Amino acid sequence: STEEAAALLAGNAAHSFLPLNRPLTTALALALMAPAHQSGWPIAEGGSASISAALVSYLRHLGGEVRCNSPVRTLGDLPDHGVAVFDTDAAALAAIAGGSLPRRVRRAFAGRRRGPGAFKVDWALDGPVPWTNPDARRASTVHVGGNAADVAAAEAMSVKGKNPERPFVLVAQPSNADPTRAPEGKATLWGYCHVPYGSTEDRTDAIEAQIERFAPGFRDLILARAVRSPHDLTAD
């Protein structure tokens, strides 16, 4: 019933990439918050690549194989299989499967509306982020967006095809949980905001301004940054 609780719920619901008045956005927020209360949101020691390495190791233990640089343009490019799982968008799957998909599925894919994307920035910092809230200084994940109304307004704009002046920014501070992520006394940080589908606008300044708003002096700590647009993230 407090403003802080409403902002916490809104920030978690915003992970849905949907307007916060849509059905099930609150359910997603609760699904994220429950494990956070129990054990926190984990950070992989040594970098996120260690997650991929562990999964590949287990797959190979089970007799599986990983093939890289092997484009799949048709179903005929796949090895013999019982079930195929595609980590692509609907349009790519339709192009690969062609007439193998039922007509009703092809029609559904053709009419599918694309949702917002993400614009991400990674930073190397000369020290920890100087958040005005001491709890944020200790956290590994920080939702930056103001109160619940601010978060809801920003998310609604991205769905409507506009980039808000003050976006909701999801920030991760991995070096808080894993000291191997940065040299002693330094810090690593990444953050992203949602952008309309097809957006080509550079949101770096808007993201950094939002962090600066709640952590004055943040920009003075930036040693280097790597920027990834929605197109870059899709290519990755």
Region spans (language model):
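Beta-strand segments within the central parallel beta-sheet cores of soluble alpha/beta enzyme folds
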Residues: 6-12, 68-72, 221-228
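Generic, well-ordered alpha-helical scaffold segments in large soluble proteins
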Residues: 8, 12, 54, 58-62, ...
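Redox-cofactor-proximal catalytic regions of oxidoreductases
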Residues: 16-46, 182-185, 191
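Conserved flavin/dinucleotide-binding core of flavoenzymes
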Residues: 134-236
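Mid-domain catalytic core of redox enzymes
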Residues: 64, 68-182
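Generic structural signal for well-ordered, non-membrane alpha-helical segments
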Residues: 2-5, 44-48, 52, 65, ...
